[in-house]
């Protein structure tokens, strides 16, 4: 009997989802959901993991669980095709995390590139919450509990999945072939790996105030688009513009397709060809 093809993916409910999430993961989840290539798709809202750096504000996490669920539905994730669940409602995941802790050393967690980056971003370098530090172990529990064969992630999360694979191999070595070792599914479009903020900074972030949220109204979206960073040296219409570092063109790459430019000559078959026209 062929092994079931199972996807598991999710988000920490630390805030409303924005178009960076859509480009980076949500759009692809919908495509995978509708592809018919997978037997089961599990998408979870990782509220327990969100508490690891939001313990002082559980109400924020609780409210964001609802916001993320609404964003999922708005993007096209279909509960009749994908199983959407809340992490904290499955206590066995915490139990499995506890047992997996015996298979991982502190030094190995410290070497995880994703963990090191996240610690620096959150200024945890002198005092790290244990729950946050062991986040990769919790993620391994999520993946293996549902016997996921495929985990779609961005390149920045690849070390986390590799850590899960290490845990699986060690567990199976000790206890026999029990757990499924997941495969990593990376984005196939380089332009969609990470969408910059509207101010041109490398990352779209709520704390930086440079997000366009999926739940923004039409007026809010229009206001944010009109204020986007473009080319500060392009002062007059007749001045030549620069494409490099121009956030607008990055967004066009992410959201537009050649068919969106039907009014332009048919010889322009790729979005990049339209940049000279625009």
Identify the role of each PLM range:
Residues 73, 77, 105-108, 145, ...:
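Hydrophobic/aromatic-lined pockets within catalytic cores
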Residues 270-278:
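Single conserved hydrophobic/aromatic residue that forms the stacking wall/gate
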Residues 172-202, 206-207:
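Feature 926 captures the class I aminoacyl-tRNA synthetase adenylation module centered on the KMSKS loop
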Residues 124-167, 171:
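Internal, conserved structured core segments that host functional sites
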Residues 2-141:
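N-terminal Rossmann-like or analogous alpha/beta NTP/dinucleotide-binding catalytic cores
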Residues 265-268:
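Short, compositionally biased segments
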Residues 17, 55-66, 70-73, 83-90, ...:
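Conserved phosphate-binding loops in nucleotide/dinucleotide-binding enzymes
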């Amino acid at each position: 009997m062929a092994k079931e093809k199972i996807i598991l993916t999710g988000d920490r409910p630390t805030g409303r989802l924005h178009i960076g999430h859509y480009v980076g993961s949500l759009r692809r989840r919908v495509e995978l959901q509708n592809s018919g290539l997978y037997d089961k798709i599990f998408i979870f809202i990782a509220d327990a993991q969100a508490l690891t750096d939001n313990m002082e504000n559980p109400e924020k996490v609780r409210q964001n669980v609802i916001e993320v669920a609404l964003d999922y539905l708005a993007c096209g994730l279909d509960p009749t095709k994908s199983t959407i669940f809340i992490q904290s409602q499955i206590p066995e995941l915490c139990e499995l995390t506890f047992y997996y802790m015996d298979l991982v050393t502190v030094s190995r967690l410290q070497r995880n590139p994703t963990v090191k980056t996240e610690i620096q971003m959150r200024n945890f370098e002198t005092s790290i919450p244990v729950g946050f530090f062991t986040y990769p172990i919790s993620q391994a529990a999520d993946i293996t509990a549902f016997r996921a064969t495929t985990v779609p992630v961005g390149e920045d999360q690849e070390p986390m999945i590799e850590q899960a694979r290490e845990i699986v191999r060690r567990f199976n070595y000790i206890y026999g072939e029990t757990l499924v070792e997941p495969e990593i599914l990376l984005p196939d479009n380089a332009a969609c790996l990470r969408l910059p903020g509207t101010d041109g900074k490398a990352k779209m972030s709520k704390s930086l105030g440079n997000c366009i949220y999926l739940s923004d109204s039409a007026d809010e979206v229009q206001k944010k688009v009109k204020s986007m960073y473009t080319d500060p040296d392009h002062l007059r219409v007749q001045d030549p513009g620069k494409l490099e570092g121009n956030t607008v063109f990055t967004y066009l790459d992410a959201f537009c397709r050649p068919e969106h430019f039907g009014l332009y000559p048919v010889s322009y078959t790729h979005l990049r060809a339209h940049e000279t026209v625009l």
